Amino acid sequence: MEGGRLRSADPGDPAGVATRTLTYHDSCYLARYNGVIAEPRAVLGAVPGVELREMDKNGRGGFCCGAGGGRMWMEETRGTRINAERTRQALDTGAETIATACPFCLVMLKDGLADAGERAGSVQAQDVAEILAASLAARPERQLPVLRPGGGR
């Protein structure tokens, strides 16, 4: 986005992105193992109309969603499921969207929202790439033709 190759839609344009709040879940792989913390937030910050609300536990000190420890394939026998606890932390921010950059975390957070029931309301979990893609301005000059079955356009 900084180089101008990706352009966001005008937030005042009806096709643009409406103002919304989101919180970002740092995946263990990106944040703790690779130190990728600021970059996803920079991408989200470049999306018009986005207000980022941090969870108490974030960055290198973030709280695992449970996928990294293989908990997505296990049932907890005691206590609260890890993804339910992380989802609760995200909901506590009051954000409308929980963003993440890890497909496994996304599954865990979506399951956590489903389990949260009414408390989750209309909160959704989305990948950073989905949020960015939805904000991009259409560039008709760059669109590829649609091919129809039988070779026609």
Regions found by a protein language model. Name each.
Residues M1-R153:
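Iron-sulfur cluster-binding electron-transfer modules in prokaryotic oxidoreductases
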